Amino acid sequence: MLRLRETQLKVLRYFHKFVGNNVLFVAPTGWGKTLVILSALREEGLFPALWLIRSLSIGYRVLEDCVKLGLNCFISAGRRRTCPLVLSGEVDEELIEDYCRKYRFQCRYFIKTFQIKVPKNISTYKILLEGVGNEHFCPYYMQDLISCDVMVQNYFRARRGFYKVVVVDECHNIFMPRMCRMDVDGLNDAILIIREFEEKLAGKILRLKRYIEEVGEGNIYLTQFLSLLDIQRIRQMIFLLENFKGSVARNFKRFIRIINSDIQYVEKGRIIGIRASQITFPTPTIMLTGTWFNIMDKFLPPSFKKIRVDVPENQRLNAVIVDDLTTRYDDFDYKMIQEYKKFIMQLKLKAGDKRILVFGTDRVLQYFTDLADFYEPQNIPKDWRGVMMLKARGRYSEGVDIPADIVVILGCPFYPPDIISRLSKIYSKMGFEDSWSLAATIPMLITTLQCIGRAKRSPKQKPNIVLADQRFQKYKDHLSPYLLFN
């Protein structure tokens, strides 16, 4: 029989007290948040429950805890992983969402889904895929017909069905703007596609590309080149791309996402689209995370009840702040770059054979890649040694385990000043009073802690933390619940 620890039972009693309310639950990684919430849902009969996650790897952890409690759990996935047309190569994965919206009611797999019995006692979408060959149904839509206690799915997958409660895992992500990137040269693919349908509009995109290349770095304003009608026509072209596949279709989809973004920005040959966070909460909602700063409380509705389990002092990571370095835009000049290089080389020399994991923004890391033994590797070697450099907001910034002896945050990972300014104005129009914190401070702090967390997936892992930017001094109070400053 599964037994909860005394501290878990204490938190469980709070959940019973707050049943029916919106709840924020903050506890350290590895504490057992998932198990406690599932226990509370079971005892209160709050099933079916919808459990929202960022990555499928987290979903399997939820499934494991459901099994321990005797609960039925199902992990659902998006069209790219479940559509038979994608898996057979008939439709490119980049186009499947739009293809499905247009042809769904003519699709033989979709129609067959509602003509067969719904499978029972299955736990993941992978099991559904095994039956497609015999029954010819659509696993994507079959997922929504599955009866279970806990339905696990991605934040951004459409929410169908009735649920008594919504659980938002790693809820700090709702404060992070969504980003889409593409190389400036990728606009050539967009021009190629648009020229197939409208030569004049393709000419506008060509002029836009030349403008972006001239700007080099900074804000770009698409409305200077494209009218609202132009943008609408480009969006509609996505339904006409059946003959395009691979990188051409991928770049065109990215271009549309960038068009749909609130902010467009160009940096180092890449176009970045940023969409401001849509901070909304259905009721009742349970939000859980191991990354939360008190400054974030002000953005929660008053209806939320907060349950917090602090990181014990003996489990906080030792940290130092390097006072004579900064990546602040006005100060990050040739001289400062040389000082950072000296710092990295001295650290590497002093550390010897230890593993040094360095995180930084694209703008910063580009000057130091020659000092790295590994830079954004395709796969993380198990027994790596030396210096590994990873992008602070790259594919390895969250959701992976990278054991290290030292973690270096190479500069405060703020967004560029122009982006912060525009994001702040957007949040202000949404009605948020402290819009600057929402645009600048909170994303920077979350990114910092998430990078550190890649080397701290269990209480046994205790890397030393080096915050290589004097500006971190200003945020010591925010970080002190997680770090011990020497």
Could you describe each region identified by the protein language model?
Residues G20-S39:
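Walker A/P-loop
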